[in-house]
Amino acid sequence: MFDIGVNLTSSQFVKDHDEVVARAYAAGVNGLLLTGTNLYESQQAQRLAQHYPHCWSTAGVHPHDSSEWRADTGEAIVALAALPEVVAIGECGLDFNRNFSTPQAQEHAFEAQLRIAAELQMPVFMHCRDAHTRFLALLDPWLDKLPGAVLHCFTGTRQEMQECLERGLYIGITGWVCDERRGLALRELLPLIPTEKLLIETDAPYLLPRDLSPKPASRRNEPAYLPHILQRIAHWRGEDPQQLAAATDANAEKLFGITLKSA
């Protein structure tokens, strides 16, 4: 099973990268996509992906960091994207929940990265929170120019999911769905996702599954907990976990153009 969303550049992992990756593989995870959220972390993610087997990375600027976008940022992302470990542009998109960067800065950076992805014919790894209508308005003109796109860590409504699926987007599901307080609505939507459009992720070190037992003392999420998330998703979808793991692996291979080792 492949984890499409690992923030291995997080300071929470700085002391034990080796152990985190080793635990993931020992747990049955067969690959990791390391997310880049700004230029520096995209460079870090690429170096980590180069260092560890069965790891790839993204290159991009998260909406929170969009105020950092400069005239030469796009050129730097293009240069990173030429490296073999980098398989997607992002994490990019819109986040109007906290507006760490202004909406205008977010939209500018998002459109610039959609343009880069289209020019390079690379998939986009996207983020959207409290910005669905504007997100789709910016994305729509590029959809027929992109080879593929995933909306990671989906936590939206039924209508929002349907509108994403109608556009052919892949949907990334995290341990958010394991939260009996916040995740119930999303849990009910799981059967609506076509198997061929589902991807799974931890978003580690964030979003530790609330129903994980025992929980780590650190309360830090890790890619080693992806099997737990997969099991729960399969249960709520009424599917066999092994078959779902194989299907989501095939989806990741198709979207990102990678080859995963057999389980």
UniProtKB/Swiss-Prot annotation:
Its cofactor is Mg(2+). Its EC number is 3.1.11.-, 3.1.13.-. Coiled coil: none annotated. InterPro entries: DNase_TatD-rel_CS (IPR018228), Exonuc_TatD (IPR024918), Metal_Hydrolase (IPR032466), TatD-like (IPR001130), TatD-type_Hydrolase (IPR050891). GO terms for cellular component: cytoplasm. SUPFAM superfamilies: Metallo-dependent hydrolases. It is found in: Cytoplasm. A divalent metal cation binds at E91, H127, H152. Keywords: Cytoplasm, Exonuclease, Hydrolase, Magnesium, Metal-binding, Nuclease. One of its GO terms (molecular function) is 3'-5'-RNA exonuclease activity. Gene3D superfamilies: Metal-dependent hydrolases. The keyword Cytoplasm applies. The keyword Magnesium applies. Belongs to the metallo-dependent hydrolases superfamily. TatD-type hydrolase family. TatD subfamily. 3'-5' exonuclease that prefers single-stranded DNA and RNA. May play a role in the H(2)O(2)-induced DNA damage repair. Monomer. HAMAP family: TatD_exonuclease. This is 3'-5' ssDNA/RNA exonuclease TatD. It comes from Citrobacter rodentium (strain ICC168). The gene is tatD.
